[in-house]
Amino acid sequence: METRRNFLKKTAAIAGGVGVMGLGGASLSGCSNSNDPLFKISLAEWSLNKSIFGKSRQLGSEEWAKLLTDDPDALLQGNIKHLDFAKVAHQDFGIDAVEYVNTFFFNKATNKNYLKEMKTIADGEGVKNLLIMCDREGALGDPDEAARTIAVENHYKWVDAAKRLGCHSIRVNAQSEGEYDEQMKLAADGLSRLTEYGTKNDINVIVENHGGLSSNGKWLSGVMDMVNHPHCGTLPDFGNFYLGSWEEKEMNGTIVISA
């Protein structure tokens, strides 16, 4: 049976790619006799989305989005409850750190008692709350300045919730519209403003390559250069980089920079 340790070693070699090969013969095998895990890993709540959403995953996108706004709890039709996520991570998977997704408690960001219960459950399991993945709160790079401001401010409550849960970050999207350079400027503006608020609350703002130009490593690294803030960074998903139309050498370089 494939052990978690061996799986992680193989994953590290694949994900590290150029970096691992560049070590000139160094390998991960030296860690095989250690009782310490090669990496400390966390479980993203989205990994269990089918078990939490259940049949609501079969709804059309418009109906699903309307329910998320009008009655988000009605979407939670699965056999795993959001409040049990930390318990499932620890008891079923042996993982002691979690990454929440805001759509599983979309109307609870300002509910102090609910957030306290989440933290109490996680603490009871010895599980660390790391971050909240934030979606469906507007485009941080919206070309319309008023809409962009609303999107930035919509994320404030998740910064506050992350702080109450003991997280270190929120994960956001660098969504925008327009030409390449213009989107970069707009996304950097929204991220900079949100990062200012996050910094006041000791919460980092990290961006996932999550569709659109954010899946272009060169573009996203350019956005990070524009923001230029120690509390704003990236959360690379190596399955989300689009490689179809760039030179391999160039794209490999930008992925390493973005990561």
Model regions: which residues?
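N-terminal pre-domain/capping segments
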Residues: E2-R164, E182-K185, S192, T199, ...
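Short glycine/serine/threonine-biased micro-segments
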Residues: A15, N209, D237
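Glycine-rich, phosphate-binding/catalytic loops in enzymes
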Residues: G25, L59-G60, G222-M224, M251-G253
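Active-site groove signature of glycoside hydrolases
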Residues: A162-E182, N201, I206-S214
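Basic- and aromatic-lined ligand-binding clefts that recognize polyanionic substrates
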Residues: G198-H231, L243-W246
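Noncatalytic carbohydrate-binding groove/subsite architecture in carbohydrate-active enzymes
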Residues: E247-G253, I257
